[in-house]
């Protein structure tokens, strides 16, 4: 009897010690920073940017190593046009342990693209692809960065073509991970045209068009599809689409005038 009680007492002590080791008390500053972060994120979602910035700045001040606090703080700064401060916070998040966080690199790639710093955007997108190859955003951003780099190198035809083909491969991978993403499909079609692949571009435009109700596709889709038909010398179909473009009052737009010239030139041949 005594032996059983003794063993039971030892078990209780062992469990108690284990629980004590696994439990880490939350400090008052951690509790307050978590509360301020939740308030800041809620304000950010509601578009109350100044309030979000203040709350998230408090959260970061109280818990400097929480990368999610910094990521949301950076977003609040960015949406107010404080771009360099935002980039600083994201960079600080990476330095404080977020170097393997794909979301941080995705956010940086997005922001550097807006600032037209395409090489830096490509570097962060490339890192995001390495860290999380199943996230379509990583591939899309890397493809976008390459496409924009190619557009800046118009004088270097061979290199531009190589970069554009690399961009196409990234877009194809992104679309395979997010097949109904309308923005991605439109960009892929444009890249396919740039790569001299109008047949593939037309297939992409048709896939994109199928995601809308009949006649409900955006002007960009209708014009892109019609331009591609013209390049393929399918002028009867292009002229049929042109009638819809005229009904929408787009014939005098820059794209409309360019398209009208393409169709007219083809019809005269």
What is each residue range found by the language model?
Residues 211, 216-269:
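Terminal, low-structured helical/coil segments at or just beyond the last alpha-helical repeat
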Residues 30, 64, 98-99, 133, ...:
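Short coil turns that delineate tetratricopeptide repeat
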């Amino acid at each position: 009897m005594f032996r059983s009680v003794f063993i039971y007492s030892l078990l209780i002590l062992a469990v108690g010690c284990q629980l004590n080791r696994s439990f880490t008390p939350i400090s008052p500053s951690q509790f307050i920073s978590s509360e301020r972060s939740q308030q800041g994120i809620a304000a950010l979602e509601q578009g109350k940017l100044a309030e979000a910035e203040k709350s998230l700045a408090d959260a970061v001040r109280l818990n400097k190593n929480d990368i999610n606090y910094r990521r949301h703080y950076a977003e609040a700064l960015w949406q107010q046009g404080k771009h360099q401060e935002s980039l600083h916070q994201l960079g600080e998040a990476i330095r404080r342990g977020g170097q393997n966080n794909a979301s941080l690199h995705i956010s940086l790639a997005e922001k550097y693209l807006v600032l037209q710093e395409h090489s830096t955007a490509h570097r962060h997108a490339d890192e995001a692809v390495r860290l999380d190859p199943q996230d379509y955003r990583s591939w899309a951003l890397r493809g976008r960065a390459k496409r924009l780099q190619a557009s800046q190198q118009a004088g270097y035809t061979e290199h531009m073509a190589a970069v554009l083909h690399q961009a196409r491969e990234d877009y194809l991978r992104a679309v395979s991970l997010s097949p109904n993403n309308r923005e991605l499909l439109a960009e892929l079609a444009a890249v396919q045209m740039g790569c001299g692949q109008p047949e593939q571009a037309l297939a992409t435009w048709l896939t994109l068009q199928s995601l809308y109700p009949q006649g409900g596709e955006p002007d960009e889709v209708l014009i892109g599809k019609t331009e591609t038909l013209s390049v393929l010398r399918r002028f009867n179909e292009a002229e049929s689409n042109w009638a819809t473009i005229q009904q929408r009052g787009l014939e005098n737009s820059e794209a409309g005038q360019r398209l009208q010239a393409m169709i007219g030139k083809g019809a005269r041949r």
